[in-house]
Each structure stands twice: as C-alpha cells, then as structure tokens.
C-alpha cells in the first residue's frame, strides 16, 4: 500500500515540476501537488531512486528540478 502511494505522490511531484521547468522549492511543490511533508519525502525518495530529479539547497530550502 505504501509503495503504491509513493508512486502516486511521485507522479504528482513530477507533474508539478514538469509544469515549472526551472524547478521549485519544497514549499512550492507541496502547494502545487497538494501534499504534506510526509508525502513529499515519500515521493522524493521514489524520484531520487529513479534519478528523475536533481536536489540542491538554495537559501536554506530544498530546491528540486527535473533532470
């Protein structure tokens, strides 16, 4: 069940990032995908494992963009 949710949330995050090619902050992704912190990290784990995103820290906040 959790594995399925991770895939769904990863898709929501990917869609939000795909609409914003320059990338988004963690806060912007959560707002665009309508998810909470726990789901954000669950989906990000999926996307990072599949090497679909790049993550950096900008002004002490996570910044994510598609590869």
Model regions: which residues?
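Short amphipathic alpha-helical interface segments
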Residues: 6-32
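A short, conserved structural fragment
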Residues: 48-58
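Short alpha-helical segments that sit at the start of domains
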Residues: 1-14, 60-62, 67
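Short loop/turn and capping residues at structural boundaries
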Residues: 28, 41, 58-59
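Short amphipathic alpha-helical interaction segments
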Residues: 35-46
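N-terminal leader/targeting helix
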Residues: 24-25, 56, 64-66
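Alpha-helix N-cap/helix-initiation sites
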Residues: 3-7, 22-23, 37, 55
């Amino acid at each position: 069940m959790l594995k399925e949710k991770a895939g769904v949330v990863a898709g929501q995050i990917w869609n939000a990032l795909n609409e914003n090619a320059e990338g988004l902050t963690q806060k912007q992704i959560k707002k665009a995908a309508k998810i909470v912190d726990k789901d954000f990290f669950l989906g990000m784990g999926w996307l990072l494992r599949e090497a679909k995103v790049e993550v950096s820290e900008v002004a002490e906040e996570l910044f994510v963009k598609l590869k």
